Each structure stands twice: as C-alpha cells, then as structure tokens.
Design a protein with these regions (language model features):
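N-terminal activation segment of mature serine protease catalytic domains
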Residues: 23-72, 76, 84, 92, ...
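Active-site-proximal beta-strands of protease catalytic cores
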Residues: 48-51, 81-84, 142-155, 181, ...
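Flexible, gly/ser-rich surface segments that form the specificity/activation loops bordering the active-site cleft
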Residues: 37, 64, 132-177, 211-218, ...
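C-terminal recognition in membrane/secretory proteostasis and scaffolding
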Residues: 24, 85, 239-472
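Short conserved beta-strand and strand-loop elements enriched in small hydrophobics
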Residues: 52, 93-101, 149-154, 307-315, ...
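Gly/Ser-rich catalytic serine loop of serine hydrolases
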Residues: 67-72, 134-140, 156, 178-196, ...
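Conserved active-site neighborhood of the chymotrypsin/trypsin-like protease fold
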Residues: 26-29, 57, 75-153, 157-160, ...
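C-terminal subregion of chymotrypsin/trypsin-like serine protease catalytic domains
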Residues: 197, 201-242, 424, 441, ...
C-alpha cells in the first residue's frame, strides 16, 4: 500500500523582501489555523519549489534550444527534485535549478520517464538552502473530483506564482493517466506542484494545457500516486522503467473503458508472452480485483517487477492465469546517439519494428536548421539505410566510419528512408551528399571516443540485429 512521504518543519514563515537574498523559515501548515491554511499553502510551497532551466544541444526527440520550468524538492537528503520530462529533456547539455532567492546550481538527470512525463533531478544536498524542505506527497489516494487545488510555478517568468481551481476529472490520454484541473497552467508552470488546498499535499505535477485559443480551464497534471511508485522504486535502487510489452491491443473508440484485447503478438522482442490473438488481459494474477482499464494500467503495474509475472486473462470465454516475462526497457539516460553535421542519429526501438523496421535501421532524431545536414536534405525521423553503400546498425561503428571521413575531409553519400506514400509503396528514399563535421557520440552518459566497439551489450533481440551497447 502506498504511504505518504511526509515532512516536518517548524517555526515561523518570514520573508525579507528588502534584500534579494531573503531568508525564510518554513512552517508546517498543519500547525496553522484552519481558516488560514489554504491561503498559506502557496507560501509554504516557496520552501520546496524551484526554478529549472535547461539547454538542449543534441535533441533525442526533443527540441533544440533553451527552456525553463518548475520543479519541487522531494528528498532533501538525496537532493532529489521532481519535474516534467519535457522540462528536463532526454539529453540536456546543461541543467540547473534555483531555490527562491538563490542562484542557479548545477543539477544532473537521475531518471527520466517520458511515458509518465516525469524526471528526477539530482543536486548536491549541501547546496540546498537550510530552509529548504521536502514537499509532502499524496502517494496513497487519488484526488477527489471537485476538491480545491492550486497550481504553483513560474508562469511566463512570473516567478513563484499560484493559481487556484478544482480537480475537474481524471483522464486517460496519450498512454497515461492525468489529473484534469481548471486551475490555470501556463508556460513556466510545467514541472511545478499541483497542491491540495485541503491538505497541503502535492497531488500532481503540472504538465500540460489545451490551447488557449480553443479552450479555457483545461489543465493536466501527472498524478502523484503514480509518480510515487517510481520514486519508491528508485529509493530502493530498483529500475522503474516501463517493461517491454510485446503486444498491441485493439482499441474500441466507443468504449468508455478500453478492454485489453490482444490484436497481435510480436515475436522479436527481448521478452515473449504466451498470449494469443483474441485474449483479453484482465489484471495481475495476485491482484485480480484491480482490473486494467487501459494499457497504461498494465505498464504501471509491471514497473519494478522482474522475471515471471502472473497475468489473469480471458481466453475463449474462460479465465486463466498465464505467466509472462517482465523486463524493463533500457533507461533513457543510458541512450547514446551520434552527431554529425548538425544531425543526431540513434536507435529508436519500437515493439512493432518487425513490421515497420525489420532491418533495425537507425533513426534521425533531429536536424539543426541551417546545418550541413539540413542543406543536404536530411529530415527528422528518416531512417538511415546506408552510408557509402554500407549498412550500419550501430552508432559506434557509424561514428568510427564518419570520423575517418571527417579526418580525410571526404564527402559521404547517405541514403535515407521516410515512411511516406509513393506509387504502390509506403516508403520514399533520399540521397544526400555531405561532408561530415563535428562527429561524436552524444547522450547523458556517452563515451568520449567512438569506433572502439567497446560498448557493453544491453540485451539481445532474438531474430533481430543487435544494436550497440547502451543504445535505446
């Protein structure tokens, strides 16, 4: 059972706005008069909310540039700060945080999960202000629709600002669950806490809003009860990354709850599940009362589980238990890509690769504007078919080859494939002649040198070409 991550603080809240470097002592809201709690929860949030800024130079499915958002301290002793994955990015060139009234300090990317839009940053605990405290997280219960909440952050650079609203609903969109709120969430709020104004607990992480041009009062936050599961696993040094799901499910758009009907079983994944087309996946065998409402529930239920896991299924009208392999996908922070001439290339393994990318071709993640690669006509999300007639399935090998061409100042011929309809085909091919420049491996944990073939293997794919060591 989930438990609340609690924190105790004492003394009186005190601000000194005469000096930019104010000091403050934080008070636990539970010692305040009931009538004042709601209005003082925002003041209390100053003690754990931070600014986050990041710079992305080599994007992995992100966007190049400088960005800012919010975050909040979840474990002072470990120096852990929670924010959105889209705030931290998958491969930040630089990452910094600042507590209120303090200068920015360096942070590192400890864990990132794009399915949940969650990132855990790490700072040196010694650099956290003495008055900084860990937020109290609502890990046990789902928020009640209609309950009062406040979104805190830095909207449009208006630092440490709060907005009020209610929990409007609970939604499942884009493969994950969301808390819906009418508390305004604007640019700069992302990654900040969504606070219960009844308890002072953080119930969610501000994440997204619908376009202001077409809607009003539609904001979304990552549920804290889901984020807490990942945090607990990380505290126990267990990888909480999503497991491989070698199944695609049929989607019924008219159903309010999507039963997990097996549409196809993939055979070339690192795990094999003994399911059949037409099976219905119901729940974990050891928790049959909690039935899955969508694929996100299944993914979340498998986090932290290893080896054999029992699934309750329905087959031909009868319920039975089958045992499936549970194995986490490689951590995003271990992913390594290649930069050449403004292009970022890497592996993008998908569960339906055996249908759409059976040869395991590398993928172009990003092409910088006005770069050599852009001028040559290379585009994002093209597949790399060959370089000078050679096929590369490993960015380390490709890096070594392009390094040699760069040293000789020779041009190379790249052939790429894009999934775009052409006469009697769903793919088109492009030929790109360009000179390699600034060839290097990139990623949070990328090696300095390439072409050595010394990257550790990260799990084999039966029936598929093995990619480089730590590529994701």
């Amino acid at each position: 059972m989930r438990t609340k991550i609690s924190v105790l603080a004492a003394a009186v809240l005190m601000f000194s706005f005469a000096s930019p470097a104010f000091s403050e002592t934080c008070i636990a809201p539970e010692v305040m008069a009931d009538g004042r709690k709601a209005e003082l929860y925002f003041a209390f949030a100053n003690c754990y909310t931070v600014k986050v800024r990041t710079r992305v130079k080599y994007p992995f499915e992100d966007a190049r540039g400088s960005y800012s958002g919010a975050g909040f301290l979840i474990d002072r002793s470990l120096g852990w700060i929670a924010t959105n994955a889209h705030v931290s990015s998958r491969n930040p060139e630089s990452l910094e945080v600042a507590f209120k009234g303090k200068k920015f300090i360096d942070a590192s990317l400890h864990y990132v999960d794009y399915l949940l839009d969650l990132a855990i940053l790490k700072v040196s605990p010694e650099k956290i202000p003495k008055w900084g405290i860990s937020a109290t997280l609502a890990c046990s219960d789902e928020p009640v629709v209609g309950s009062a909440v406040g979104a805190y952050g830095h909207p449009y650079s208006l630092s440490y600002s709060g907005t009020r609203g209610i929990v409007s609903g609970k939604r499942y969109r884009h493969g994950r669950r969301w808390i819906q709120t009418d508390a305004p969430i604007n640019k700069g709020n992302s990654g900040g806490p969504l606070i219960s104004l009844n308890t002072g607990e953080v119930i969610g992480i501000n994440s997204a809003t619908y376009s202001k041009k077409t809607s009003e009062g539609l904001g979304f936050a990552v549920p804290m009860y889901h984020a807490c599961t990942l945090i607990r696993l990380l505290e126990r040094e267990i990888d909480p990354s999503p497991s491989y799901i070698p199944i695609s499910f049929a989607f019924d758009r008219d159903a309010s709850v999507s039963d997990l009907y097996v549409a196809i079983v993939y055979r070339k994944q690192p795990v094999h599940w003994p399911l059949k087309v037409g099976d219905r996946v119901i729940a974990l065998a050891d928790d049959p009362e909690v039935e899955f409402e969508n694929q996100g529930d299944l993914v979340h239920a498998l986090r932290g589980k290893r080896n054999k896991v029992g699934l309750l299924i329905e087959r031909s009208g009868k319920r039975e238990t089958v045992f499936v392999d549970s194995k986490p996908r490689p951590k995003l922070i271990t992913r390594v890509g290649l930069h050449v001439s403004g292009i970022v290339i890497g592996r993008q393994p998908l569960k339906d690769d055996e249908l759409l990318n059976p040869d395991g071709l590398l993928t172009v993640y990003d092409v910088a504007s006005a770069s050599i690669g852009s001028q040559a006509g290379v585009a994002s999300y093209n597949h790399l078919v060959s370089v000078d007639g050679r096929s590369f399935k490993d960015v380390d090998d490709l890096c070594g080859y392009l390094k040699k061409a760069e040293a000789k100042k020779e041009k190379v011929k790249m052939v790429t494939r894009i999934d775009k309809y052409e006469y009697r085909a769903q793919s088109k091919y492009g030929l790109h002649l360009m000179k390699p420049k600034n060839v290097k491996l990139v990623g949070p944990e990328a090696p300095e040198n390439c072409g050595n073939g010394n990257m550790e293997a990260d799990g084999e794919k039966e029936g598929a070409v093995i990619s480089s060591a730590r590529l994701w």
